[in-house]
Amino acid sequence: MGNSQNSEKIVELVPKDYKLSYSDFVGIGNNGNLWVEDCDVEELVKEYGSPLLIISESQFRQSFRQFKKAFTDNYNGEVEILYANKSNNSLALRHIMNQEGGGGDCFGVNEMYISLLAGTNPKTLVLNGSNKQDEELEMAISNGLCINIDSMDELSRISNISTKLNKTVEIGIRLALDLDSLADKTGVSMHGPGTLKEQSDSTKWGMSREQTVEIVKAAQQIENIHLKETHFHLSRMTNEVEPFAVMAREMVTWSHYIKENTGWTPPCIDIGGGWTYGRWYGTGPNSQIDDQNAPKYIDYAKRISEVISEEAAKYDL
């Protein structure tokens, strides 16, 4: 499983000219049919049958580039984008992500396997998930992935496995943030309606402030474990920008608390995903979140970068 990430030239993207454009690479052609890039979807269905999943490589690349640029243009620091492999764990898309310089968020053995098979740099991969099995931990440690942990027991298991394998391992700590300021913000999720705080408290696992301090202190005493980051995932429960800014601010506040109580300042904060995507008015299924009026990437990036910079300066981090 060799590392081929970033070894190829940048792929040039050329927008298409449609009669009616849904994006630069999807639209209605002059013949009245739906087109994806240079392909008439009706002709594709005739050849491959229906239902048919079609992905625009150019749209995929463009979206990644726009998202990353929004943050690199607004944040005065290092930015790394991790693709959520669970969204589509195909070998082809993972290879495209490698070409674009994207890392990866992995759940389980299969997602790690595909990422490594595609030649992804293991240092850009993170293993997430609750109740990780020893098989997953061994695979992550053997290949040099960072592991986001959420319990003292998991820290102990990682220590034992890394010692057995004679490997060092980077870890992150998944936080259970106190999002009190979102108690009056309504959100939606697969578990039903409720405020964003209620949804977060009931569905997001992780460590409390006190538990985080305890686990950091324990990790500092283990020679083969290196602390890398803290992590939180708000999830796709709203398309408003401010809740994500609240989450980012709280993560920096926790960084200060951790530093004051352990001497360790997290060099990286992983702010998770859940970003709402926009779509053409009247297309696609209706959902509880208003995708048709979603903020743009730049809206998220400007506000979140502003908040992180303000809080970091406030606490001299």
Regions found by a protein language model. Name each.
Residues 58-66, 214, 250-253, 303:
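A non-catalytic, amphipathic alpha-helix used as a structural packing/dimerization or gating element
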Residues 1-170, 190-191, 217, 221-222, ...:
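A charged N-terminal "starter" segment
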